[in-house]
A protein has these predicted regions:
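Basic, low-complexity segments
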Residues: 1-56
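Catalytic center-proximal scaffold of phosphoryl-transfer enzymes
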Residues: 32-423
Length: 423
């Protein structure tokens, strides 16, 4: 007996109304009371709500449809379900279900409880980036783009990620052979033969920082950078940012990324992605020494090495580039423009120091999210989205990527495990 299955003031009961509910085992005929008259937007069926029926589907089927529709185009998902499980559901119905539940997934992704504690010495990372998604024409009206007609064809989806790094004692210390304690050799008697001078110990490779398993949380949003920044900050707080020893913000050279960091993470150590910086070194050497020339390649390799491995490497690169500039002309103007990238971001390019502290210097985690969370589903051939539809898909994909999909369904439909897994 459903406790809410009774008439409320102003309602009229249509007793035993028949409803067909789709399940993992096929359609089911469900007779239940249906109440109208109080809500002008529609009636209510308390038994449907009690059983977790959503868009005419049982919880077990709805869970499967959401997962399939988030991973594949809707018609492909429909075909896969038909082939793998003999489940005959149209692609449009999968789309409607995702439109219904997508906002719930989004709220769930931003409301996970913070950990009780973080291990001592934990470093907390925040990364942000953006990627364009093809959208319908009405979504780009009045927006300028990079095409010949000046009309935008895409809308930017902001992608953020937070994660923690394993404590230093769980990682190999950086350059331990050079910076660690000296080894004390035993003293020899005068009558003992003196050993040959041993070769210097091989220089240890820089320690590779590693993420704590299960700590990565993705967030996506079509909102402007200021709103997205507050969403990302809230997610970081929920995941224990305030408990970390150090907060690091990693990003590329986009102006909105650093403005977001300045406003929402003013206490963080800012690091510009090394691989973006290396690309700009390549552009600079092409300007100064010619495209695809041996001299340009040689200088690029040398300057990238300086930038990454030498203390004050960015200052050395700037100095060498200025020495290589001609006194006047077009090449000088282009080189000065390219060099401004390094001068403006000098304080975020102390890569030797970052590596000595065992920190990440690349924003590969968020760039991987741009491809795996957004690109693989929303940027396939022939796709054009409205923003709400894209956002609903991404909400589910973030929950999947964060490994919270089962938790979402357990929270939405609490009850015995056998009942949750039922049709």
């Amino acid at each position: 007996m459903c406790p809410t299955d009774q008439t409320r003031p102003g309602e009229h009961c249509h007793a035993r109304r028949l409803n067909t509910v789709e399940s993992l085992f096929g359609p089911l005929a469900l007779r239940r009371n249906y109440y109208t008259g109080r809500d002008p937007s529609g009636g209510r069926a308390p038994l449907d709500q009690s059983l977790g029926v959503v868009e005419g589907c049982t919880p077990g089927l709805a869970r499967l449809l959401c997962r399939a529709g988030a991973l594949e185009p809707f018609e492909d998902a429909s075909q896969s379900l038909r082939e793998y499980g003999a489940i005959d559901i149209e692609g449009r119905r999968i789309q409607r279900l995702i439109q219904k539940l997508g906002p719930e997934f989004g709220r769930w992704n931003q409301s996970q409880p913070a950990p009780q504690a973080l291990p001592k010495g934990t470093v907390f990372y925040v990364e942000a980036d953006g990627t364009g998604v093809p959208v319908r024409r009405q979504e780009t009206l009045g927006r300028q783009g990079k095409g010949e007609d000046g009309q935008a064809k895409t809308r930017e989806i902001k992608v953020g990620v937070v994660f923690t790094q394993a404590p230093p004692e769980e990682q190999t210390p950086f350059l331990q052979g050079r910076l660690g304690p000296a080894k004390i050799l035993p003293r020899l008697r005068p009558d003992q033969p003196q050993p040959a001078t041993p070769p210097p110990p091989p220089e240890q490779e820089p320690a590779r920082p590693s993420r704590v398993a299960g700590s990565t949380r993705y967030l996506t949003s079509p909102d402007p950078a200021p709103e997205f920044g507050h969403q990302l900050r809230d997610l970081a707080r929920q995941q224990g940012m305030a408990l970390a020893k150090l907060v690091v913000f990693l990003g590329d050279g986009a102006a909105w990324v650093w403005e977001l960091a300045r406003v929402c993470f003013p206490f963080a150590l800012l690091i510009l992605d090394f691989f973006h910086a290396a690309e700009h070194v390549g552009l600079l050497t092409e300007i100064l020494f010619g495209k695809d020339t041996p001299e340009a390649k040689q200088h690029r390799e040398m300057w990238v090495h300086l930038l990454k491995n030498q203390e004050q490497g960015v200052d050395q690169v700037i100095l060498l580039a200025r020495q290589a500039m001609p006194q006047r002309g077009k090449v000088r103007r282009q080189a000065q423009k390219a060099l401004a990238y390094f001068e403006n971001n000098r304080d975020k390019m102390r890569y030797w120091e970052y590596q000595a502290r065992g920190l990440f210097i690349g924003s590969g985690v968020v760039e991987a999210g741009c491809k795996s969370v957004v690109g693989q589903r929303l940027k396939q051939s022939g796709m054009f989205w409205n923003l709400s539809g894209a956002e609903n898909i991404l909400n589910i994909r973030c929950v999947l990527e964060n490994d919270h999909f089962n938790q979402f369904w357990n929270k939405r439909f609490p009850g015995p495990e056998a009942l949750k897994a039922a049709a």
